[in-house]
Amino acid sequence: MSFKGTTVIAIRRGGKTVVAADGQVTFGYTVLKSNAIKIRKLFNGKILAGFAGSTSDAITLFEKFEEKVKAREDGIIDIKRAAVELAKDWRSDKILHKLEAMMLVADSENILLISGTGDVVEPEEDVISIGSGGNYAYSAALAYMENKKLSAADIAFKSLKVAARVCIYTNSNIVLEEIS
C-alpha cells in the first residue's frame, strides 16, 4: 500500500515513547490542509496511535483498535494482542477490508505497525515510520539514533523535518505526542 499525504513516525528511547506526524492533507496534487492532526492518545493516554491514509478509515480503525484493547477481561493493556485481533478482522471483514489506511500504535513497551493486509510488524530497532515520507523519516531516524544525546522527541522531530524536505506530500507542521 502506498498513501500520499502524510508521514508518521514512532520512536522509543530513554523510557519515552513518541509518535509524531506532519500536518499535510492532499487531494490528488492539491494541498487541502497543512495542520491536520493524524495522531491521538487512546485508552486514557496509555497508547499512542498514528495513521496514514484516509481520515475516515483511520477513525474507524482507531475505534476498532480501542475496542480490541478494552475487550480483555483482566484489564491488562496488551497492544500486541489487540493489534493481531484488529489485523485479523481488518483482513477478513468485508467492510473493514476496504479501508485504506495504515496504523502505528505504541505504548511504553511496544511499537507496532498494523496494515490492512493483515500484517502486524514490531520493528527490530525502536523506530518505525509509515506514509509517503515514511522511508525518508525512517532512514533519518536510524542515523539520528546513533547520537545517544538526542531524545525520542528530538529524533522524531528532526526525522520528520528531513522527510518534509524531500517528500512533496509531507510538510513541517509537526504534531508530537509522548508517553513514559
From Swiss-Prot:
The active site is at T6. PROSITE patterns: PROTEASOME_BETA_2 (PS51476). Allosterically activated by HslU binding. Gene3D superfamilies: Glutamine Phosphoribosylpyrophosphate, subunit 1, domain 1. Keywords: Allosteric enzyme, Cytoplasm, Hydrolase, Metal-binding, Protease, Sodium, Threonine protease. Belongs to the peptidase T1B family. HslV subfamily. NCBIfam families: ATP_dep_HslV, PRK05456.1. HAMAP family: HslV. Protease subunit of a proteasome-like degradation complex believed to be a general protein degrading machinery. This is ATP-dependent protease subunit HslV. The gene is hslV.
